[in-house]
């Protein structure tokens, strides 16, 4: 899908027969369209609430107010010290008090499959304001293109607005499915993923999950590359700057080694395997930071760097660590470095993950076709997400939505407001279908 008005224009895709769609769903779809301005106002309000790491309290309060205003119960799942001892919790573990995820369960009649809709409340820091044409927390709207600007507009305040709006429509239309529909509004997607982990550990599980994060209406993600963060330390040999040839400058040695490691790691892209061939470089090596220092007239004898890599299967965390360590040691030995490099494997690390089921993939495609999207490309991503926590519990999961947004993590992040009601209707169709099929009934019915 390209451009601004291609949701259904000229589409020859299969559109579901309205006669077999429950009248309540039709009314709900009409309500979604009729309240476009409400959804715009809601997203604008959410964008105007800064919610970076450890400062999410205000947006959590607002979500809880919205939920309780609908007569529902907001279950708070704390981000507390219990996470510190969890094997799959990532650092840093915050000590800031009263930080909570929000979970809302719409109970079904019974007998149907349950579904989680997961979105995240936290955002990336706003960055350098000088690089922007719109202030990061303004929620500025370009009326000509019906586009809203602001940090988190796509990632993931749009997902939050869609979940809250869908919740409101379901409640006010008195819709009830056979299975439970569970909304998870989580913290720390942008840094640790511990919010989704905490919700699942608290028992908020389901038969499938959709994470509203990172894609547009014609794209879904069913697997992720692995990631590995590490520190690299290198020691040199002391000497005065006036006779630097007698020493070994640790800063220079480390810079040269990092270039070698980057180039060696990137060469692995030449042998990448499908479906990762759709990316030019799923193997990525990024230097996040470097440090070296010395007195004025001396060479630095210690240097360190913080690095981050991504890697597709069949590589694993262990095989990537072995590759990097071998490359670093052989490079140092070949150049007669005074010391071998020291790798410190204490950073963020995730294995490649895939946990979608064919049933869930087909359901996403079917709901998209019903709404005029001829095809949804479902495939891998070189990024990472909270999918790994669902995979660990055997819960089928895809990332889908929240819609057409641009510049996440960059200046002038923005989102096309037409996709708020559009994606809301797709998730309504997905929910109606998934939650109305019994656990053991794997045959599909017509929506």
Regions found by a protein language model. Give the residues of each.
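Active-site catalytic microenvironments for nucleophilic, acid-base chemistry
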Residues: 49, 166-173, 260, 264, ...
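Metal-dependent amide/peptide-bond hydrolase catalytic core
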Residues: 2-23, 27, 34, 69, ...
């Amino acid at each position: 899908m390209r451009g601004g008005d291609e949701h259904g224009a000229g589409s020859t895709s299969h559109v579901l027969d309205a006669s077999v769609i429950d009248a309540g769903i039709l009314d709900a779809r009409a309500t979604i369209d009729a309240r476009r301005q409400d959804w715009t106002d809601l997203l604008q309000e959410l964008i105007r609430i800064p919610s970076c790491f450890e400062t999410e309290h205000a947006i959590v309060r607002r979500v809880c107010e919205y939920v309780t205003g609908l007569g529902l119960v907001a279950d708070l799942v704390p981000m507390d010290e219990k996470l510190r001892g969890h094997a799959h919790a990532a650092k840093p573990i915050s000590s800031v008090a009263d930080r909570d995820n929000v979970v809302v369960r719409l109970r079904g009649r019974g007998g149907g499959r349950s579904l989680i809709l997961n979105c995240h409340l936290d955002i990336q820091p706003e960055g350098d304001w000088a690089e922007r044409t719109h202030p990061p927390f303004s929620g500025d709207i370009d009326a000509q293109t019906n586009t809203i600007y602001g940090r988190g507009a796509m990632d993931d305040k749009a997902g939050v607005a869609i979940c809250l709006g869908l919740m409101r429509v379901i409640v006010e239309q008195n819709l009830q499915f056979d299975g439970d529909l569970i909304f998870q509004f989580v913290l720390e997607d942008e840094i640790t993923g511990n919010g989704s982990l905490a919700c699942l550990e608290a028992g908020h599980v389901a038969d499938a999950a959709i994470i509203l994060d990172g894609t547009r209406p014609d794209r879904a993600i069913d697997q992720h590359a692995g990631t590995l963060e590490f520190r690299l330390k290198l020691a040199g040999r002391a000497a005065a700057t006036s006779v630097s040839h007698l020493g070994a400058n640790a800063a220079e040695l480390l810079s040269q080694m990092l270039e070698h490691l980057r180039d060696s790691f990137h060469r692995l892209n030449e042998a990448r395997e499908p479906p990762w061939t759709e990316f030019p470089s799923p193997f990525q090596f990024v230097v996040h930071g470097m440090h070296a220092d010395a007195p004025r007239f001396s060479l630095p004898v210690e240097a360190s760097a913080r690095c981050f890599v991504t890697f597709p299967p069949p590589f694993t965390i262990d095989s990537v660590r072995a590759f990097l360590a071998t490359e670093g040691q052989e490079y140092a030995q070949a150049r007669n470095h005074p010391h071998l490099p020291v790798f410190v494997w204490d950073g963020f690390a995730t294995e490649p993950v895939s946990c979608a089921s064919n049933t869930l993939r087909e359901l996403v495609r079917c709901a998209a076709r019903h709404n005029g999207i001829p095809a949804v490309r479902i495939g891998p991503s070189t990024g990472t997400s909270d999918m790994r926590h669902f995979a660990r519990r055997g819960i089928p999961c895809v990332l889908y939505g929240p819609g057409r947004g641009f510049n996440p993590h960059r200046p002038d992040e923005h989102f096309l407001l037409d996709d708020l009601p559009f994606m809301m209707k797709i998730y309504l169709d997905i929910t109606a279908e998934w939650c109305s099929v019994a656990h053991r009934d794997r045959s599909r019915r017509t929506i």
